[in-house]
Amino acid sequence: MFKTLAADFRIIFERDPAARNGLEVLLCYPGFQALVCHRVAHWLYQQRLPVIPRLLSHLSRLLTGVEIHPGARLGQGIFIDHGMGVVIGETAIVGDYCLIYQGVTLGGTGKQSGKRHPTLANNVVVGAGAKVLGNIQIGENVRIGAGSVVLRDVPSDCTVVGIPGRVIYRSGVRVDPLDHSQMPDSEARVIRMLLDRIEALEDQLEGLNLPPAEEAIDVTLAPVGDRCQLRDRTIEEFLDGAGI
């Protein structure tokens, strides 16, 4: 445990230029303080000691703003920068030398028992406010953008952004935003179906022979061609990330 804590301590000076000296890190870095408490709580948890590990985790959350379940397995050299609002669930696994920013959630989905939280390989960076949910695998050297919501496995050496998370770089090469072979966009497909249905209903409405009304009602519809162009443009903007 002490070797792991030493790696946690050293990595701060490598990754944070604001770290001036060891005393400052010990007293003013809540992320490191949370890791110290977690290392102790996790050891007690492994000894199957009741209540005390959870109590220590709870006190750590009150002190640092970081909530790490004592059952979570964290590698060495982890840096939780700023810390406030970080939540790491019971069955989460975090590899060596990962960087986690404030507001990150490594959470579960559903109420099932067993492995239900994500697994992060080595050297993963999770940006501020990102959510990684469910029993998914995040490969080595992955970068997850701030505010992203990741719900599926991510291969190594990728950059993921957006809601839901999409791979935009793979091994340093930008991925075509319209290529959904890796991460299909179900929301875009639903919107496409709805727009097609609206267009069909409008065509049916144009073909109706309505009886004359006492007062004229303006039911002028845009030409079909204009509606198709609007639909296609809207879909393309959505697929390219508009509104995310």
From Swiss-Prot:
Q: In which pathway does it act?
A: Amino-acid biosynthesis; L-cysteine biosynthesis; L-cysteine from L-serine: step 1/2
InterPro entries, per database record: Hexapep, Hexapep_transf_CS, LbH_SAT, Ser_AcTrfase_N_sf, Ser_O-AcTrfase, Serine_acetyltransferase, Trimer_LpxA-like_sf
The record's principal subcellular location, in a coarse class, is: cytoplasm
Check the record and name the Pfam families matching this protein: Hexapep
User: Which E.C. number(s) belong to this protein?
Assistant: 2.3.1.30
Q: Name one GO molecular function term.
A: structural constituent of carboxysome shell
Location(s), subcellular: Cytoplasm
Mind listing the UniProt keywords for this protein, alphabetically?
Acyltransferase, Amino-acid biosynthesis, Cysteine biosynthesis, Cytoplasm, Repeat, Transferase
Sorted alphabetically, the Gene Ontology BP terms of this entry are: cysteine biosynthetic process from serine
**Reaction equations catalysed:** L-serine + acetyl-CoA = O-acetyl-L-serine + CoA
Which top EC class is named for this enzyme in its record?
transferase
Q: Does the keyword DNA repair apply?
A: no
The record ties this protein, via NCBIfam families, to:
cysE, EPS_EpsC
Q: Which family, according to UniProt?
A: Belongs to the transferase hexapeptide repeat family.
Protein name stated in the entry: Serine acetyltransferase
Q: Which organism is it from?
A: Synechococcus elongatus (strain ATCC 33912 / PCC 7942 / FACHB-805)
Q: What is the lineage of its organism?
A: Bacteria, Bacillati, Cyanobacteriota, Cyanophyceae, Synechococcales
